[in-house]
Amino acid sequence: MNNNEILVSLDIGTSAIKVIIGEMVNDSLNIIGVGNVKSKGIRKGAVVDIDDTVYSIKKAIEQAERMVGLDIRSVIVGIAANHAILHPCNGVVAVSSENREITSEDVIRVKDAAQVMSIPPDREIVNVIAKQFIVDGFDEINDPRGMLGVRLEMEGIIVTGSRTFLHNTLRCVERAGLEINEIVLQPLASGEIALSMDEKNLGTVLVDIGGGSTTISYFRDGYIQQTSVLPVGGDHITKDLSIGLRTSTEEAEGIKVKHGHAFYDLASEEEVFSVPVIGSDQHDQFNQLEISEIIEARLEELFMMVVEELRQSGIHDIPGGFVLTGGSSAMNGILDLAQDVFQNRVRVAIPDYIGVREPQFTTAVGLIKYAYKNARLTGRKLSESNQAAPVAKEVRKERPDVKQETKPARKEQPHDGEEKGVKGRMKRLFGYFFEE
């Protein structure tokens, strides 16, 4: 781990909070640590209880730290697409160096120039996506660094989000004792792992089925064109099963994962299991076919909502088909049901990395890949703060019985250039979030 970059992602979801520790070796990602805990304080992707959310973040961080003996101090944070809006942008700068060679500094300046636009006071910039760079009129350039020119332009997309939504999410991360290296819109991260470049160019819909919500993202011409969030996810299936089987939500979740099938026509009547009845000592017998009827009804409703959302957005031609990801996309039969509803090609995206080969980790892994790619373009390093430190930590062992203000831990030793490069940048973006 000596000279390689260690990056940590934090994916805050409704049903689970995931932490991935990745080691970048010659631009290749190795997963060396994973934290995955049930989340509290999140509903439909938004923070509803700061103390519960902070506690869940700390537990996930601890779990990942124990795997590798690493002291996690900074993270790449995924921001849900709730209330996200995409705006076209354009920036132009003169190349600053005397020899007219374009550097990372010029790329930063042209990105900053592209952000000079009128944004409502209740919104904040989350990401700036470069569609193409133009050097002295020559377009379709992905990376202009090292080229010679006088005039550098960038055409791109600015992603803005609700200032309040961002405030609450980032405040939880800060109160968990973590610094924020980078923030990334979750669909951008998911697309980095789930979609091939051909799929992004053709026109493909990425459907990320989370616990409390489902994110729909449309990619075409190499970049994201549209994103929206539906307030339905895997937790709704669990609640449906809980009601239908008259059992607890915990039991219903276990049954969904172990015996669930999304396509009624292919479900088995022979797969029988016992279900404890809530409030009594009795057990009822059910088979997979019976619960499949419940699951299929909810997922079919969700997929029809996806179709309607795309129709209202004016998206009709989808030559790249549909790609499913997120925890609920691992269910048996979901491909058959999706193909039946969408009448198009459908596949499930799974991260191809040891230890995280499940669709629920797509966003968390994608956060590292996306942030690393962007940091390279601007010459930034993201990993200065995380260090090997196998020291027992007391700060996150017990949850206090009484809710109280949690002071950020482990900030007493600032690193060289940290205020300027990382936290300073975040302060400029989200000034009033970090008031002392």
What function would you assign to each model-found segment?
Residues L10-A16, I79-A80, L206-S213, F219-G222, ...:
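A short acidic Gly-Thr/Ser loop motif
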Residues P231-S248:
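A conserved active-site cap/scaffold subdomain adjacent to cofactor or substrate pockets
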Residues A16, A80, G161, F263, ...:
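Glycine-rich phosphate-binding loops at beta-strand->alpha-helix junctions
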Residues M1-A16, I20-V75, I79-T204, T247-E250, ...:
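Nucleotide/phosphate-binding catalytic cleft detector across ATP-hydrolyzing
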Residues R347, P351-A392:
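Glycine-rich phosphate-binding/hydrolytic loop that grips phosphoryl groups
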Residues S9-L10, V19, V77, V173, ...:
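Residue-level signature of catalytic and energy-coupling elements of molecular machines
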Residues L152-E153, R220-Y223, G314-G321:
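Short, surface-exposed connector motifs at secondary-structure boundaries
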Residues E308-G320, M331-V346:
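ATP-binding/phosphotransfer module of carbohydrate and carboxylate kinases, centering on a glycine-rich
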